[in-house]
Swiss-Prot record:
Molecular-function GO term, any one: manganese ion binding
Family the UniProt entry places it in: Belongs to the arabinose isomerase family.
Alphabetic keyword roster: Arabinose catabolism, Carbohydrate metabolism, Isomerase, Manganese, Metal-binding
Pathway: Carbohydrate degradation; L-arabinose degradation via L-ribulose; D-xylulose 5-phosphate from L-arabinose (bacterial route): step 1/3
Lineage: Bacteria, Thermotogati, Thermotogota, Thermotogae, Thermotogales
NCBIfam families linked: PRK02929.1
Role, per record: Catalyzes the conversion of L-arabinose to L-ribulose.
Binding residue positions for Mn(2+): 302, 329, 346, 445
Cofactor names: Mn(2+)
Organism: Thermotoga maritima (strain ATCC 43589 / DSM 3109 / JCM 10099 / NBRC 100826 / MSB8)
Name of the protein this chain belongs to: L-arabinose isomerase
């Protein structure tokens, strides 16, 4: 469902006519070699497209106009090979709507000590050209990612590739919508939010459809489509064959087919459900939701559209990377002193992309929702480094709360727990991490990912100009409290 190859990134090289045709030709040749080399590296998720060297204000403005109008262009990378006076860039940068990365590099890795002359100095001027360019970004208060180092370095390429994945997620969010079936769970605060502001800042179009419309589609699903889907279930999962289980699984298959059809019609990238509004649905969607998340859709339970959008964004960022991403909830604690852990789960809806084993389809009673016993996938989660992230609406801005965690083995069986689960240790430790999370107002609903790291989420928040706070191994609680207070002042004063 998610294809990052559909996007491209425009590589913009700055110079000026002052240098003459011979120097400008060398600039173009060297830029072409850089871009060709980058495109040969499989680390990059999308194609990088070199545009003609930019030498005047009109050329710069025109290229940004074209980038804004091209839905394939997910972002722009700028590099000043020579000195490119930044007043020429003001009009173009002022209209730019695409995520921007400023690459501060140089064609040659080393100074040619024996042969360096003024021709070389005249050509290789990014050392001061990019400083000039950095000033105009700072002066205009523009969001951007800055990557410094030689373009052949692994670390440089890794940072560019991460940012590209983030930019793809931003473009994806601007092109699709989040479908809400029903409203938020009654009386819950943290799942609420300003949907208009979300579309302005995050690009997400969030709209509601009646559950009855989905229920009618479920009733109309042809039996042959159900049988085809059951074959797929048997291949991918450990599936029971008793009559009680099969009846429930068939109902989830119908819900999955109807949901997928509906989401495709609406060009949706994510969706929400709520157990308080199920109308004529036979079950609370469980297996169906897990399967659609596995395809790449974002999801939020109990109407949590912010969680749905964040899960989708991270799924785009992590496309084709090892690991997975899921809707998650901090459910219960293991509080042995010195080994405090969080058990993450939800009633039904945990994505199998984070499973460490072949998932089992199980059918169990669920009193919440008042419907028939729902089928769901049950498994233990993957182990290793992960992130837990939440978006909350602070009234005058969105805040992204991010916690680095370590997913650990589940060493004891839980034979009576009928839901997928993952066990993690928050960093730096349970008490400090949880204190910081609560101080920041982080939600009980999160996006949990073993596919990405914190840098992706920082890049995402900075590109979208929303607040973020990070809870990791370097946490100092007193400094964190100060950061929250300073942020309150900064975002209160900011008028953008």
């Amino acid at each position: 469902m998610i294809d990052l190859k559909q996007y491209e990134f425009w590589f913009l090289v700055g110079s000026q006519y002052l240098y003459g045709l011979e120097t400008l030709k060398k600039v173009e040749q060297q830029a072409s070699k850089i871009v060709d080399s980058l495109n040969d590296d499989p680390i990059f998720p999308s194609k990088i497209v070199l545009k003609p060297v930019l030498k005047s204000s009109s050329e710069i403005t025109e290229i940004f106009e074209k980038a804004n109008a091209d839905p394939k262009c997910a972002g722009v990378i700028v590099w000043m090979h020579t000195f490119s006076p930044s007043k020429m860039w003001i009009r173009g940068l002022s209209i730019n709507k695409k995520p921007l990365l400023h690459l501060h590099t140089q064609y040659n890795r080393e100074i040619p000590w024996d042969t360096i002359d003024m021709d070389y100095m005249n050509l290789n001027q990014s050392a001061h050209g990019d400083r000039e360019h950095g000033f105009i970004h700072a002066r205009m208060r523009l969001p951007r990612k800055v990557v410094v180092g030689h373009w052949e370095e692994k670390e440089v390429r890794e940072k560019i590739a991460k940012w590209m994945r983030v930019a793809c997620a931003i473009q994806d969010g601007r092109m699709g919508q989040i479908v809400r079936f029903g409203d938020n769970m009654r009386e819950v605060a943290s799942t609420e939010g300003d949907k208009v502001e979300a579309q302005i800042k995050l690009g997400w179009s969030i709209n509601t459809w009646g559950v009855g419309e989905l229920a009618e589609r479920v009733k109309a699903v042809p039996e042959r489509e159900v049988e085809e889907l059951l074959k797929e279930y048997r291949e991918k999962y450990i599936m029971p064959e008793d009559e009680y289980s099969l009846k429930a699984i068939r109902e989830q298959a119908k819900i999955e087919i109807a949901l997928r059809e509906f989401l495709k019609e609406k060009n949706a990238v994510g969706f929400t459900t709520t157990f308080e509004d199920l109308h004529d649905l036979p079950q609370l969607p469980g297996l169906a939701v897990q399967r659609l998340m596995e395809e790449g859709y974002g999801f939020g339970a109990e109407g949590d559209w912010k969680a749905a959008g964040l899960v989708r964004a991270i799924k785009v960022m992590g496309t084709s990377l090892p690991g997975g991403t899921s809707f998650m909830e901090d459910y219960t604690y293991h509080l042995t002193p010195g080994n405090e852990l969080v058990l993450g789960a939800h009633m039904l809806e945990v994505c199998p992309t984070i499973a460490k084993e072949k998932p089992r389809i199980e059918v169990h009673p669920l009193s919440i929702g008042g419907k028939a016993d729902p089928a769901r996938l049950v498994f233990d989660g993957q182990e290793g480094p992960a992130v837990n992230a939440s978006i909350v609406d602070m009234g005058n801005r969105f805040r992204l709360v991010v916690n680095k965690v370590l997913s650990v083995p589940i060493e004891r069986k839980m034979p009576k727990l009928p839901t997928a689960r993952v066990l993690w240790k928050p960093l730096p430790d349970f008490k400090r991490a949880t204190t910081a999370w609560i101080l920041a107002g982080g939600s009980h609903h999160t996006a949990f990912s073993t596919a990405i790291d914190v840098e992706y989420l920082i890049d995402w928040a900075e590109a979208l100009e929303i607040e973020y706070v990070v809870i990791d191994e370097n946490l100092d609680l007193e400094d964190f409290k100060k950061e929250l207070r300073w942020n309150e002042l900064y975002w209160g004063l900011l008028k953008r």
